[in-house]
Swiss-Prot record:
Keyword terms, alphabetized: Cytoplasm, Elongation factor, GTP-binding, Nucleotide-binding, Protein biosynthesis
Name of the protein: Elongation factor G
Organism, scientific name: Salinispora tropica (strain ATCC BAA-916 / DSM 44818 / JCM 13857 / NBRC 105044 / CNB-440)
GO cellular component, one term: cytoplasm
GO biological process, one term: ribosome disassembly
UniProt binding sites for GTP: 17-24, 81-85, 135-138
Gene coding for it: fusA
InterPro entries in the record: EF-G-like_DII (IPR053905), EFG_II (IPR041095), EFG_III (IPR009022), EFG_III/V (IPR035647), EFG_IV (IPR047872), EFG_V (IPR035649), EFG_V-like (IPR000640), G_TR_CS (IPR031157)
Protein's UniProt keywords contain GTP-binding: yes
HAMAP family: EF_G_EF_2_B
Biological role stated in the UniProt entry: Catalyzes the GTP-dependent ribosomal translocation step during translation elongation. During this step, the ribosome changes from the pre-translocational (PRE) to the post-translocational (POST) state as the newly formed A-site-bound peptidyl-tRNA and P-site-bound deacylated tRNA move to the P and E sites, respectively. Catalyzes the coordinated movement of the two tRNA molecules, the mRNA and conformational changes in the ribosome.
GO molecular function, one term: translation elongation factor activity
Length: 698
């Protein structure tokens, strides 16, 4: 019983938001109030505890999701502070995969911003219950109620407003608690806000408080039958009943509690911590994690209990200067101890648990074991990468992995000296282990190493880390768009025979395949292989070689040397020779037949399309729209936001280089924009011809 009690008091949460909404500042305040830090670290001073990489402290943004643990009112809160910059979506994606709940932080002036929408959708995908904290209410132009309305309009959320602000901008002194119908105020700038006063609601806010309290009860009645019954009969609710109903609605994903304050001015943070404990789920409140047996088909469940067999998911790899490779693991069930042997069921490899650490941003404490509900870092895992399942060898299970987006931008990188060449390969290997959206390939024609990622900032930081952490000095080329190739129609029964007779044993492999296009959405796989060979026409041991050969050929495409995506290859038939057939022969045949089939399947070029959002004064609207149209952009929506106009569009990434400067000069520096990857789309024929000619040197 004690173990279940302990688990009921655990909250695994993420703090997520758009860049600059004040996420890291909020986390720093949480650590201060829960007693982990004795001095508050400020982001703008480069001293935030959670931003521990050198680049984060210089740039004032969060890049990696730092994990830390704190105690509040008898509960253990494990927090993952995630980056808000779109180039680092992979960090957000993997955090959400292993969290039980989240706090979305909003800028009270800007409201719901593009990256907020993005993260909200990622959280929807993993069914993560979440609450909202409207921050920065001390800033000029802050508007709490507009922010709440944007949650409804843009996130399709059902906000449960639990607080309304007392005063805004420089007048902001506290909040009205709509459940207890009382005022909480933080007066005096000098204190760190540890103490707040509980007072009567100010007379001028009495009507607003009554109105929003009524709205809160109406919304609760809409999403909770027990409340509805009592509400219709006009009965009074106790504070406990209201809190229990909010908790039920939040955990079921039906509604989102909304609180407010100003983390930087130390206002509203403690009630937010109370809400994390009161409304976000413990590991016992979320459904048992689903997985499959090692056959990849039979469904299996793992309940969050220490009596179940051990199962955990590796969600992040980090290289530590002193400890080497650390693997972050969310333990879903059972117990795991230092030195125990586990199996990586995703790769079917045995692993030994070296040391187990409880991480606190970049400090750590060693532990002898970890149990269901824990988020830990493990030393000593050799073959485990992001998304792999670790489990008890006697009870294997494979948990659902994660899907990561394709990179959209690439640069060539050349080491300056021979010594740098060796360091570069080590650096690239380490960084690729840590970050699944960072890809590397060798350009066969130029002999250059080409690295690709999610945006210019992403690649900037990776190159910067190579310099700082691995002492690699390298020349970096101009950023290039990461085009892709695909096919538009299905071709059947394409065959290729690989035959070589040169004295002694020869080589022989014959394969027949069909090739068809797969849907090109971000959730779909970019390649599928199916084996439909019957009657032992190709021995089983050669089948993976055909697959491997085809995948090799896909890396270099057929039109212009860009990777081929969105294809399903079915191996239909073939033939082998008792003596002359080998894995190599079938690999070559797989590679050649893929190229032949793709050429016949109406190949096309794809380019990354970016969702671009421009915020501009009314008088510059015409220029902004004209400019987007001239970049082959498609306008999708226009709206008004806080006195400015917002234009949302889809624009090819290739047309967005240098946009910052152009927008600045067209609007005298008054407009701003953000962009994030949306999808891959077919390149118009005239543009495609130019790209292919340039790539093939014709």
């Amino acid at each position: 019983m004690a173990a279940a009690d302990a688990l009921a008091n655990v909250r695994n949460i993420g703090i997520m938001a758009h860049i600059d909404a004040g996420k890291t500042t909020t986390t720093e305040r949480i650590l201060f109030y829960t007693g982990i830090t004795y001095k508050i670290g400020e982001v703008h001073e480069g001293a935030a505890v959670m931003d521990w990489m050198a680049q984060e402290q210089e740039r004032g943004i969060t890049i990696t999701s730092a994990a830390t643990k704190c105690e509040w009112k008898g509960h253990t809160i494990q927090i993952i502070d995630t980056p808000g910059h779109v180039d680092f979506t992979v960090e957000v994606e993997r955090s959400l995969r292993v969290l039980d709940g989240a706090v979305a932080v909003y800028d009270g002036v800007a409201g719901v911003e593009p990256q907020t929408e993005n993260v909200w959708r990622q959280a929807d995908k993993y069914n993560v219950p979440r609450m909202c904290f409207v921050n920065k209410l001390d800033r000029t132009g802050a508007d709490f109620f507009r922010c709440v309305q944007m949650m409804v309009d843009r996130l399709n959320a059902t906000p449960l407003v639990l607080q309304v602000p007392i005063g805004l901008e420089s007048e902001h002194i506290g909040v009205v608690d709509l459940i207890g119908m009382r005022a909480l105020t933080w007066r005096g700038e000098t204190q760190k806000g540890e103490d707040y006063a509980v007072e009567e609601i100010p007379a001028e806010l009495a009507d607003v408080a009554t109105e929003w309290r009524e709205k809160l009860m109406e919304t609760l009645a809409d999403v909770d039958d027990a409340v509805m019954e009592k509400y219709l009969e006009g009965e009074e609710f106790s504070v406990e009943e209201i809190k229990a109903a909010i908790r039920r609605a939040t955990i079921a994903g039906k509604a989102n509690p909304v609180l407010c304050g100003s983390a930087f001015k130390n206002k509203g943070v403690q009630p937010m911590l109370d809400a994390v404990v009161d409304y976000l789920p413990s590991p016992l409140d979320v459904p048992a994690i689903e997985g499959t047996a090692t056959d990849g088909e039979t469904p299996m469940l793992r309940k969050p209990s220490t009596s179940e067999p051990f199962a955990g998911l590796a969600f992040k790899i980090q290289t530590d200067k002193h400890l080497g490779k650390l693997t972050y693991v969310r333990v879903y069930s059972g117990v795991v101890e230092t030195g125990s042997q586990v199996v990586n069921s995703t790769k079917d490899r045995k692993e030994r648990i070296g040391k187990i650490y409880q991480m606190h941003a970049n400090k750590r404490e060693e532990r002898g074991s970890a149990k269901a509900g824990d988020i830990i870092a493990v030393q000593g895992l050799k073959q485990t990468t992001t998304g792999d399942t670790l489990c008890d060898p006697a009870n294997p299970v494979i948990l659902e992995s994660m899907t990561f987006p394709e990179p959209v931008i690439e640069v060539a990188i050349e080491p300056k000296t021979k010594a740098d060449q060796e360091k570069l390969s080590t650096a690239i290997q380490r960084l690729a282990e840590e970050d699944p959206t960072f890809r590397v390939k060798l350009d066969e024609e130029t002999g250059q190493t080409v690295i690709s990622g999610m945006g210019e900032l992403h690649l900037d930081i990776l190159v910067d880390r190579m310099r700082r952490e691995f002492n690699v000095e390298a020349n970096i080329g101009m950023p290039q768009v990461a085009y892709r190739e695909t096919i538009r129609r299905k071709v059947e029964k394409v065959e290729y025979t690989h035959k070589k007779q040169t004295g002694g044993s020869g080589q022989y492999a014959r394969v027949i395949i069909s090739l068809e296009p797969l849907p090109l959405d971000n959730e779909a796989p970019t390649y599928e292989f199916a084996n439909a060979v019957t009657g032992g026409r190709i021995p089983r041991e050669f089948i993976p070689s055909v697959d491997a050969g085809a995948q090799d050929a896909m890396q270099y495409g057929i039109l212009a040397g860009f990777p081929l995506v969105g294809v399903k290859l079915t191996l239909v038939d073939g033939q082998y020779h008792e003596v002359d057939s080998s894995e190599m022969a079938f690999k070559i045949a797989g590679s050649m037949v893929l190229k032949d089939a793709a050429r016949k399947a109406d190949p096309a070029l794809l380019e990354p399309m970016m969702a671009v959002e421009v915020t501009t004064p009314e008088e510059n609207m015409g220029d902004v729209i004209g400019d987007i149209n001239s970049r082959r952009g498609i306008i999708q929506a226009m709206e008004e936001r806080g006195g400015a106009r917002v234009v949302r569009s889809l624009v090819p990434l290739s047309e967005m280089f240098g946009y910052v400067g152009d927008l600045r000069s067209k609007t005298q520096g008054r407009a701003s924009f953000s962009m994030q990857f949306d999808s891959y789309a077919e390149v118009p024929a005239s543009v495609a011809r130019e790209i292919i000619a340039k790539a093939t040197g014709e």
